[in-house]
Amino acid sequence: MRTARHAIAALAVMALATAACTRSADETEIGAAPAGSSAGDQAAPDGGGNGTGADEATGSRLDQGGFGDLENVCHDGEPGTATEVGLTADEIHLGTVTDKGSAERPGLTQEMYDSAVAFAGWCNEHGGIGGRKVVIDDLDAKLFEYNQRIAEACQQDFALVGGGAVFDAQDNGARVACGLINLPGYAVTPQARVADLQVQPVPNPVYEFASAGYRWLQGAYPEADKLGVLWVNLDGPSTIHAQIVEMAEKMGFDVVFDEQYRPLGETGWRGFVQKMRDDGVTAFEMIGEPENMVALQQAMQTEGWYPTFTHLQPNYMDEKFMQEGGSSMSDATYMRSAFPPFDMAEQVPALADYLELMQRYNPGGKTAMLGMQGLSGFLLFAVAANECGEDLSRACILEKAAAQDGWTAGGLHSAQTPGNTTATRCDLAIHATADGFVYDEALTEPNEGIYNCDPDNVIELTDDYGVPRPAA
């Protein structure tokens, strides 16, 4: 029972990752290359004649050591004195945590490790981090072995970069105790989100919550002010449920339906739909996995009732969800995202660079949004290391990473404030249609590139989430 319950938790908890779009190994990300083909062939931009936007005479941005609008990311140099674990005169060891080897969900967050491998191959081709070869240590937590992987990393790694684990509070502070720094791809539990010695490139704070999607839909559907929330009562989803309810109430929504479904074997979907209809629900959010949302949508279709709009977290931007649930989907189903969908590669050079990076340096690897989020951590680490120069240290990495203003990973995602406490003010709207996931420019009302950046896109939360509030 513990294994089954935790397996379901692994599925649902991933909704907490800021822009996570995870899936098992046999699933494909929207906009990514189909199985057996290369991501770069599928979505290369039409820039300078070579599909990368760079001049043919000089090669792509990657050939020049750049990524998006970042230049000279990795390069040769004269390494300084090695004084910390994982740092030698010739190498720098970086650990990437995933749950890809879990028996319950094979391939979970595989894309993060695959991005790490691709980054290291490209970076080392250009001289490494200040002349040091990047060595990626594979820290596969397999859901239940996070504590063991942290113990290993404490003995071998200079930093954790670009990874994450579903049960990321299992080490009980061991990472911090050994002085190991972390630039994670994502953090899930409240304890992990506020942990010391950490800079999140795409922050998932506890006491700030991205409200852009609700704000946009509130403007588009002002009459839809009766919210229904359906969720599964497991550790991670229970936190995001509480955050959504607090945010919605602060925005003026009346939460008239707040129910839990069973993590395994739920059959009462029509009953939920009937109760939502009877309770007058006009706005709806479901917290969990796409498979359960498909079952609920089918029940809505059978009952002939849909809410005025449905808002979902970014983990629903999934090809399997579209394949199985597209025909029963409401016409007004939306989500917000800090990352553009893959079919915008022609408009977003850094997105094209990510696809090219994977095609060239890890062609068998998975391309997915969480892979991009992990890559943001590696790019932030490299930029910070460049600023540290010969005086490379863990303390310097944290200082320089946290000092980056408007971090976009070269344009890969919206502007972020690296750290643990500040949610992005910049998002875009995705409309889930029967034909796929589409950037909704009209709903987004972009004011900075393709994004809407507005202070009102974030709500400050005041309820107690069991961890200290950030210092003023």
Question: What residue ranges belong to the model's regions?
Answer:
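Beta-alpha junction/loop-to-helix N-cap segments that form part of ligand/metal-binding clefts
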Residues: 27, 107-114, 125-196, 261-267, ...
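Extracellular/periplasmic periplasmic-binding protein-like sensory domains
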Residues: 203-204, 300-375, 457, 464-470
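Extracytoplasmic ligand/sensor domains, especially the bilobed periplasmic-binding protein
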Residues: 157-259, 309-334
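C-terminal motif of bacterial Sec signal peptides marking the signal peptidase cleavage site
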Residues: 17-20
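Extracellular/periplasmic ligand-binding modules, especially the Venus flytrap/periplasmic-binding
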Residues: 233, 241, 245, 290-293, ...
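Solvent-exposed, acidic/polar segments of extracytosolic/periplasmic ligand-binding ectodomains
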Residues: 45-81, 407-472
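Extracytoplasmic "Venus flytrap"
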Residues: 77-90, 95-117, 141, 231-239, ...
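Short, low-complexity, disordered segments immediately C-terminal to signal peptides
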Residues: 22-47
